[in-house]
Amino acid sequence: MFEGFGPNKKRKISKLAAEQSLAQQPWVEKYRPKNLDEVTAQDHAVTVLKKTLKSANLPHMLFYGPPGTGKTSTILALTKELYGPDLMKSRILELNASDERGISIVREKVKNFARLTVSKPSKHDLENYPCPPYKIIILDEADSMTADAQSALRRTMETYSGVTRFCLICNYVTRIIDPLASRCSKFRFKALDASNAIDRLRFISEQENVKCDDGVLERILDISAGDLRRGITLLQSASKGAQYLGDGKNITSTQVEELAGVVPHDILIEIVEKVKSGDFDEIKKYVNTFMKSGWSAASVVNQLHEYYITNDNFDTNFKNQISWLLFTTDSRLNNGTNEHIQLLNLLVKISQL
């Protein structure tokens, strides 16, 4: 009577559930490097870290560089090779930007984990992994920590260095206090070159059977500005959109630009032409229409910067003045000022140059 619910049926259900979970997983996680050999274009860091696998003598580390260059992926790949998937659960503490980063979290959560006695590995883990006698605390986006929290962290690093190693990850190394940075081995993660990034995007699109028009992957890379994580996410979002359009539909550059919130080139040229006219009423009218269409003023600032600064038709003095106006507007937008007013002010001032 209950034959259909035997062990074989349960295994099939479990396998199906695992496949569905993998299919729904973000591609950023699905294609994250599983070991150091899979880390792309960070040869120096990978070479040095591979040596630690042989000696199991790991220093405190500071990974810094632009977003989406593999900093977090590299330390996670290293910990997998050091401990294996099972022991990692008890040996690794990872805190990221979603966690409280003040002095209290350092004094409580970080300190409590750092002082724990290292658990004994299983026989299986010892046979297959180095399993060094220390834990690792990964602090992602450490440059967002307050100076007081960083000072408290320095004392914790000194006290528990016998049983705990720290890996600090940040975009801006200058925001890490010197007493903390001096206790770490620094690894600079450079922005991925175009060929490596394109190869990775092409590999993922082939694995996922995603079809793209010519130049789409290059456009994704251009929009993501070297951030491979953002590029992979954008590729996945575009693939979902193409699926809804029906079988055989390719991802187009237009779809990618719409998903990324990029202002289309023809609209950007219209803005430039309105600025050239120098007519305040025309500029004001166009800005009103533009903002009602839902475009972002920040995107316009970035694209105007690219248009004017890379254009050889403008002299150096004009570019200097444009750069200052764009910098001022970008700063004000980041401080939360009104987008409509700032965009209007920017375009009017450019028209007066």
From Swiss-Prot:
Keywords: Acetylation, ATP-binding, Cell cycle, DNA replication, DNA-binding, Nucleotide-binding, Nucleus
N-acetylmethionine modification, residue list: M1
Taxonomic superkingdom: Eukaryota
Entry keyword RNA-binding: no
Complexes and interactors: Replication factor C (RFC) is a heteropentamer of subunits RFC1, RFC2, RFC3, RFC4 and RFC5 and forms a complex with POL30/PCNA in the presence of ATP. Component of the RAD24-RFC complex which consists of RAD14, RFC2, RFC3, RFC4 and RFC5 and associates with the checkpoint clamp DDC1:MEC3:RAD17 complex. Component of the ELG1-RFC complex which consists of ELG1, RFC2, RFC3, RFC4 and RFC5. Component of the CTF18-RFC complex, which consists of CTF18, CTF8, DCC1, RFC2, RFC3, RFC4 and RFC5. RFC2 interacts with ECO1.
Family membership noted in the UniProt record: Belongs to the activator 1 small subunits family.
Name of protein: Replication factor C subunit 2
Gene name linked to the record: RFC2
